[in-house]
């Protein structure tokens, strides 16, 4: 049983971008914005995809503003800032995604 799982429905914020890394690996990165109607706030999540076939599908099918459901696991990226202080960022490591109709398309 998997204990670290997250599913978010929101809108693509940053256009998906694939980076080639050393050791013949690649990662596709994008962000997703979740708007909470109860608190009238927006939460941003960074998403990393390490699966080559899934990355190709993301680049071919997702664009900034698209409504999407992402499922994956949470990873903590720890890093040192320029001022020497330490910080961290939560990242969703993508396992699957589903392109959804926009909210205006659902109403029609």
Task: Put a short name on every predicted segment.
Residues 1-108:
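Single-stranded nucleic acid-binding surfaces, predominantly the OB-fold ssDNA-binding core
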């Amino acid at each position: 049983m998997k204990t670290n799982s997250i599913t978010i429905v929101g809108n693509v914020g940053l256009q998906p971008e694939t980076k080639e890394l050393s050791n013949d690996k690649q990662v596709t990165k994008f962000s997703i914005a979740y708007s909470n109607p109860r608190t009238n706030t927006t939460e941003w999540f960074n998403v990393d995809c390490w699966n080559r076939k899934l990355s190709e599908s993301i680049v071919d099918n997702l664009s900034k503003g698209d409504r999407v459901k992402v499922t994956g696991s949470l990873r903590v990226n720890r890093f040192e800032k320029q001022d020497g202080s330490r910080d961290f960022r939560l990242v969703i490591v993508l396992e699957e995604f589903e392109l959804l109709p926009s909210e205006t398309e659902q109403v029609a």
